[in-house]
């Protein structure tokens, strides 16, 4: 289990605070482009009396994919069924889930890129024709029977859209990239959560927590609860700027929202490899983290903040990374990598 305070992976305590999640689209903070699209598509589907087309949310973890799926189910008047790619081991497991759905239900599959191929193929007729093809018998006596399914909506979520097979990706009618939240959006989320949790917090403290939350609501809510703990013991239960800073410093969350592992990645590239480029396998060895963990959990935020960039030859540190470590940046020695070049991240899959 990942016990980092800054991990965007869902922890047990995050699930326990279900009441922090908005229940309506107009209560959902951030992701304005996604909200606008989904509002139109939901209203159009309801107007025609149809199920909403299948939706794919993709982006780093902790940005609200599951919350949006729950809101969509409520807006469509159906129930939400939640599962994940690794949990569906056999085609029969998925068939049982599909046959248990009702009209306008939403089936949410997290980590959908991890579905195995035999299971994935069951989804094709289910998504296209609302039908389930079942093989009965074996050998020459085997025959295929098609069962009709209720009109449902499949919502897939993935942190690695590039790993989806083309046949599966092409069957989604709505594709929505999820973006990191800005500080003001996170501040609004923190103020809302504080009201629900009955936390006495001022705006400066809320903004301080927001700025260290890695653009991720899940992390913002987790940090809020840890700052509350500190304030209850050290600050008479009042979360102000001073108590927020002291609590976050105690948690070793710096002004950029980095923890020790983020800094290890930057330090490895700068100090051990002269700024790069360095391959992901080598970087993984030096940092002591799995490749998938670096790519899914750490890199997206470091890229978005402009501290590293990905090139065909490997990862490179930017001038901003050198400034963060207070290491001199030599243009001739370290190449021409600058913060503007990190727009490359937006073009990457």
UniProtKB/Swiss-Prot annotation:
One of its GO terms (molecular function) is ATP binding. GO terms for biological process: DNA recombination; DNA repair. It catalyses: ATP + H2O = ADP + phosphate + H(+). Its EC number is 3.6.4.-. The keyword DNA repair applies. SMART domains: AAA. The keyword ATP-binding applies. It is found in: Cytoplasm. ATP binds at residues 20-21, 62, 65-67, 128-130, 171, 181, 218. Has 3 domains, the large (RuvB-L) and small ATPase (RuvB-S) domains and the C-terminal head (RuvB-H) domain. The head domain binds DNA, while the ATPase domains jointly bind ATP, ADP or are empty depending on the state of the subunit in the translocation cycle. During a single DNA translocation step the structure of each domain remains the same, but their relative positions change. This is Holliday junction branch migration complex subunit RuvB.
């Amino acid at each position: 289990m990942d016990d980092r305070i800054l991990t965007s992976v869902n922890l047990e305590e995050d699930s326990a605070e279900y009441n922090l999640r908005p229940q309506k689209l107009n209560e959902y903070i951030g992701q304005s482009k996604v909200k606008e699209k989904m509002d139109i598509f939901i209203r159009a589907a309801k107007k025609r009396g149809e199920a909403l087309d299948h939706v794919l949310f993709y982006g780093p973890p902790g940005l609200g994919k599951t919350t949006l799926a729950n809101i969509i189910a409520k807006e469509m008047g159906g129930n939400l069924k939640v599962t994940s790619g690794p949990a569906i081991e056999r085609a029969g497991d998925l068939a049982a889930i599909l046959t248990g759905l009702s009209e306008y239900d939403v089936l949410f599959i997290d980590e959908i890129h991890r579905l195995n191929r035999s299971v994935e193929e069951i989804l094709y007729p289910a998504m296209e024709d609302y039908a389930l093809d079942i093989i009965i018998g074996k050998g020459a006596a085997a025959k295929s029977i098609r069962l009709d399914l209720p009109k449902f909506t499949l919502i897939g979520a993935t942190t690695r859209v590039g790993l989806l097979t083309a046949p599966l990706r092409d069957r989604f009618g709505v594709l929505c990239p999820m973006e990191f939240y800005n500080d003001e959006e996170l501040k609004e989320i923190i103020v809302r959560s504080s009201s629900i949790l009955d936390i006495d917090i001022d705006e400066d403290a809320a903004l301080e927590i927001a700025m260290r939350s890695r653009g991720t609501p899940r992390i913002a809510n987790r940090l809020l609860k840890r700052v509350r703990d500190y304030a209850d013991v050290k600050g008479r239960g009042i979360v102000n700027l001073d108590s927020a800073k002291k609590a976050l410093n105690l948690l070793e969350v710096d002004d950029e929202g980095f923890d020790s592992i983020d800094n290890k990645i930057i330090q490895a590239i700068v100090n051990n490899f002269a700024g790069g480029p360095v391959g992901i396998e080598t970087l993984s060895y030096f940092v002591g983290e799995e490749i998938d963990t670096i790519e899914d959990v750490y890199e997206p935020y470091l890229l978005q903040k402009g501290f590293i960039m990905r090139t065909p030859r490997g990862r490179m540190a930017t001038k901003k990374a050198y400034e963060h470590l207070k290491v001199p940046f030599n243009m001739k020695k370290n190449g021409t990598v600058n913060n503007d070049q990190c727009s490359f991240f937006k073009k990457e899959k």
